[in-house]
């Protein structure tokens, strides 16, 4: 926790700190009064460089081809406009959503622009198609999350279809070696392992692999499922690694759904085409707010459409279909080391 606070502190200005206070104060006040109050602007922003991916993961809307919205890559112009407008109060950028960020040819340049605006940068990748380790280290990414869920190719490929575990290991090993050469502490490399039925037996092996490579952290994560058929196919046998409780052929989140959502007040998403999404669970941008290419971000953040959505969250969040499978407010990560 101390390390995390120290990391955040480096990117704080008086304006950003005041905005952070206003954002969370208005969020908690909204819960108490049950009406949307929005002071300030999002301290955290998720940006989608692309919704295209090189892998075919069976529980991912991009990987399965179930994503309905158009596919494409964010342009540098859209990214620059966004950063120019949000950087005075937004201190953290989460650079992924649906898709592999490094497929965008301008992605490294986007990272450099974000760092020029003194923004904390989080990036998640499947690490199969990376630029050179030198480019990645030079980009000063704060946290590089590597999604790889297996200690053997056979197990890994059951979920990360079309991926090669050996390439992932080789790429991450190269990044860590380049960090040492450059005497850089960044990026902190986090190996993220989604625990599923077919890979829970490899937890000790993956700990050994990540220790040997020298990653900064191994992070275990619970799997998100969508259909009844997924219960027996993907949910691990050990309930410790589940976010759901199962009754017969039905499943539901362990802790229910409360009429609140921190993300809607503090962490929206801008998709590759500039469309503002209320959160990362709105995969197909069903709740229309507006486009950053056509409006100022400040106008979108406090417009009527977003107000009405927040009001519904406070009134009856369970009536919003996408919220029924959202992990907001519950721990999705499992302590590993």
Which ranges hold each PLM region?
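Radical SAM enzyme [4Fe-4S]-AdoMet core and its adjacent flexible, acidic
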Residues: 1-11, 69-70, 74-77, 117-120, ...
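Conserved alpha-helical substructure of the radical SAM core
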Residues: 2-143, 154, 158, 162, ...
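Short, charged low-complexity linear segments at domain edges
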Residues: 23-42, 291-311
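Short, basic and Ser/Thr-rich N-terminal targeting/leader segments
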Residues: 43, 263-264, 319
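Processing junctions and N-termini across compartments
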Residues: 47, 51-54, 255, 317-320
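Extracellular secreted precursors and ectodomains with disulfide-bonded cysteine-rich loops/domains
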Residues: 51, 259, 277, 321-324
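Local cysteine-cluster metal-coordination motifs and their immediate loop/turn environment
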Residues: 54-62, 281, 321-330
